[in-house]
Amino acid sequence: MTQSLPSIFIDNGNCEIQPYVSLADMTTFRVGGAAEWFIAPHNLKELQASYAWANEQALPITFLGAGSNLLISDQGLPGLVISTRYLRQRTFDPETCQVTAYAGESLPKLAWQAAKRGWSGLEWAVGIPGTVGGALVMNAGAHGGCTADVLTEVHALDKDGTVQVLKPEHMAFQYRSSILQQSPKPVLLGVFQLHANQSAEQVKATTQSHLDHRLSTQPYDWPSCGSVFRNPLPRTAGWLIEQSGLKGYSLGGAQVAQKHANFILNSGNATATDIFNLIHYVQQKVEENWSLLLKPEVKMLGKFPQIT
């Protein structure tokens, strides 16, 4: 990648695509290289224009929400990175108890706004440091609830730029997975069916309880991506890692958290390669001890070292 390229303006000059933009501060791990091209659209029109431009140039496209559950290579990402950080809008329909939220909307904020209205269904989402778009792609969940439980429809872009409406039966939801991982499409918004079957105080109390539990059991002192591995039910990844004696283990600037072993921390000077190598080391040790290969929940983007 080169740092000397000028910005490109599309959509009659209204939409700026910038070259060589660092992505590290846009991820919760605080690591990673630069985007070859980058844009943070302020509305759906700019999103559609930038998406069309990248397709015309035959560039790879990466969508970036809150940057949680994500590890970006130190070498950065080729093509266009589209950040949804400005695509934040939500509407609550009191007649249907449905919530419509844009892809960049904060999941915890959405959960709290629903709770204040006494609408149940999103209490589980309060401690997940992600966006609506990421939740739809990953089928995010916690505390026994998940995105699939409340989803009514997803609006996404086809490659030709037309809006496609996906119903739950089109989403192929599984544990931390959806069709949008196998066949990626830009997510515009999601519509969620909630329920006004409790008082606002009850819903807020449950929401606060979930948040308190998360804060008391998970590390927040250093940057991380959230849970690194999927839970191989009925066991948990954290328990297997802890029983393998890996709590506190470090490689470079990456460390297995003492508070919760399914978290890897950037202890201050980690690189993406440090974190990648520690993920692989944890997998090796757990497999040696338990004959079970932990599957990463964190999504890895870009080029990483070959594992032999």
Swiss-Prot record:
Chain's role: Cell wall formation.
Any one GO MF annotation of this record: FAD binding
Superkingdom per UniProt: Bacteria
UniProt keyword annotations, A-Z: Cell cycle, Cell division, Cell shape, Cell wall biogenesis/degradation, Cytoplasm, FAD, Flavoprotein, NADP, Oxidoreductase, Peptidoglycan synthesis
Gene, per the UniProt record: murB
Domain (FAD-binding PCMH-type) ranges: 30-213
UniProt pathway annotation: Cell wall biogenesis; peptidoglycan biosynthesis
Subcellular location: Cytoplasm
Needed co-factor(s): FAD
Keyword Nucleotidyltransferase in record: no
Protein known as: UDP-N-acetylenolpyruvoylglucosamine reductase
This protein's GO CC annotations: cytosol
The protein's Enzyme Commission number: 1.3.1.98
Reaction it catalyzes: UDP-N-acetyl-alpha-D-muramate + NADP(+) = UDP-N-acetyl-3-O-(1-carboxyvinyl)-alpha-D-glucosamine + NADPH + H(+)
Active site, UniProt feature: 176, 227 (proton donor), 297
PROSITE patterns per UniProt: FAD_PCMH
NCBIfam families: murB (TIGR00179), PRK13905.1 (NF010480)
GO biological process: cell division; cell wall organization; peptidoglycan biosynthetic process; regulation of cell shape
Family: Belongs to the MurB family.
Major place of residence: cytoplasm
Enzyme kind, highest EC tier: oxidoreductase
Family annotation (InterPro entries): FAD-bd_PCMH, FAD-bd_PCMH-like_sf, FAD-bd_PCMH_sub1, FAD-bd_PCMH_sub2, MurB, MurB_C, MurB_C_sf, Oxid_FAD_bind_N
